[in-house]
Amino acid sequence: MAEKRNIFLVGPMGAGKSTIGRHLAQMLHLEFHDSDQEIESRTGADIAWVFDVEGEEGFRIRETQVVADLTEKQGIVLATGGGSIQSKEIRNNLSARGIVVYLETTIDKQVARTQRDKRRPLLQVEDPREVLENLAATRNPLYEEIADVIVKTDEQSAKVVANQIIEQLGF
């Protein structure tokens, strides 16, 4: 790989963006970044706290700035937050500054992967499945719209998915 290109992972919560991203970055000798972790680092607080204090709108403003900053780097793998796709500015930055990989997963798999995770503010409700279904209806078309590559993550290990991404990208 002569030039260091960016790889941006998009997809719903529970798709495996962070886990797969770490494997991918290690395999390709690239830096790994997670936009949610970067927000936590910059604010000194976790995502749930940011949602509680600033609301989703405040969180999305922070997320837009973080993604703008990170996508200006070269030679990175970036795991984006599941909702970041809703921002036109973020979609434009991802499309213009790297290769976008959509990690696709089923609602059943999302529920299984996120059911014990208390760090997901949008799922702290009585029926998280309904929330995930509603989010999928809104967000999945946006993931598909900007994706250069789509990879299904159900029933596969993170390492296998990372290898599939590398093969599809021809790296």
Swiss-Prot record:
Q: Which GO terms describe its cellular component?
A: cytosol
Kindly state what the record says about how the cofactor is bound. Binds 1 Mg(2+) ion per subunit.
The prosthetic group or cofactor this protein requires is: Mg(2+)
Q: Which residues bind substrate?
A: D36, R60, G82, R139
Tell me the keywords, alphabetical order: Amino-acid biosynthesis, Aromatic amino acid biosynthesis, ATP-binding, Cytoplasm, Kinase, Magnesium, Metal-binding, Nucleotide-binding, Transferase
Query: Keyword ATP-binding: yes or no?
Result: yes
Q: Which residues are involved in binding Mg(2+)?
A: S18
Q: How does it assemble?
A: Monomer.
Task: Give the function comment from the record.
Answer: Catalyzes the specific phosphorylation of the 3-hydroxyl group of shikimic acid using ATP as a cosubstrate.
Q: What is this protein called?
A: Shikimate kinase
